[in-house]
Amino acid sequence: MLLVGGMLAGCKGSFIDEEIKIVRQGEGVMRLWTVEQPREEAFLRQKARPLKATDGMSETYQLLKKRMLATVTDTANPGVGIAAPQVGVSCRLIAVQRFDKEGEPFEFYLNPKIVRYSEEKVCGPEGCLSIPDVVDSVWRAREIVISYKEDPWVESRTEVSATGIHKSIKVKQNFSSKKETIRGFTAVIFQHEIDHLDGILFTDRVKDKK
């Protein structure tokens, strides 16, 4: 969305070979898939697959997050949110700028879904990195409740005991579900990005309004 105004090495997860190739083509900004190309628009309109715990522990996933962040914060074409399908990877992963938090950080969400919409709506201008040069007004819920999966990771560290014996300890975060209530403009960003995961573009919402 545009603003208008320590790992398990070698773990592949469920990423297909073409996605791995796209992710590993570099380390910086990724090429955005847009509606200007029929094949890419068809891809953007597909429903993305959920991520598994093994995906979150893969090198491909970590590099994808790094490159998605570089893409959405690119000064040549900055945004306030991005979804994995926009860079050619059909999985349920988004990054959202949290304007409701101190420092307005970008945060990633695995398998996000909206479990409740407020009845109160707001209408505001939206743009999209995948739909160049188009801005229009869209109605969105003012408040939403989202659920998502925690980012899984495995970290190995070595500790020395009192007897001088070195031992390796693995620390693993659970792939558990979390819920959060989001309000205001940040809620709008979440709705826009989660739409991408379901093959819905903001211009479809404009048509709904009309």
Language model features: what each stretch is:
Residues 1-9:
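Sec-dependent bacterial lipoprotein signal peptides
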Residues 10-210:
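Positively charged
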